[in-house]
């Protein structure tokens, strides 16, 4: 690990700005969101990708984002404030929700509108299970972001479930496919359980939130 990343880890150990995240509200519709000002970074992913666990690790809080035993059950945009100008956005899990086609289509429309028209949205984190990356629904989310040039970073979560060589090969394949969708989109291996990949992710988040 480079000296600069070691320094970053030490700085975060002393002051992680995401520790101050607090739950603001859950929005069922875009009109329920706060005013379109400040900075928002959104987290998206299939219902079994480990999105809630990743948010809890990033914010160093055990139960900030509640993990559901029924994947896809909660269809709300959950907002967490860092300060009066910065918000983390937890988008509804997609892919396994046992809901009607009408509800799924409505939420697809809501998510696409949020990603493509929210002016204060500065970045999108897409979480995937490294063992099942880039499913059709993942690619749809990424394509919506690509259409408007929204900076996007993919977390291949649960990297601890694969051997190092297999994890590296999967990452290379995902990076190649991402480049075909948008040349500036990036990806990394990550494990919320083992807290691996935190330094790279934190650099990305701190930059988007203009902490550095």
Language-model segments: which ranges?
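Structured catalytic cores of enzymes that bind and process phosphorylated ligands/cofactors
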Residues: 41-49, 54-55, 70, 78-81, ...
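Conserved G1/Walker A P-loop phosphate-binding module
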Residues: 2-98, 211
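Switch II of P-loop NTPase G domains
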Residues: 33, 71-78, 92-122, 130-144
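Conserved C-terminal guanine-recognition region of P-loop GTPase G domains, centered on the G4
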Residues: 112-185
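Glycine-rich, phosphate-binding/catalytic loops in enzymes
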Residues: 40, 60-61, 104-107, 141-145, ...
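Conserved nucleotide-binding/hydrolysis micro-motifs of P-loop NTPases
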Residues: 73, 86, 93-96, 131-134, ...
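Canonical P-loop GTPase G-domain recognition
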Residues: 18-30, 161-212
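Helical mechanochemical/support elements of P-loop NTPase systems and associated helical scaffolds
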Residues: 63, 73-76, 103, 107, ...
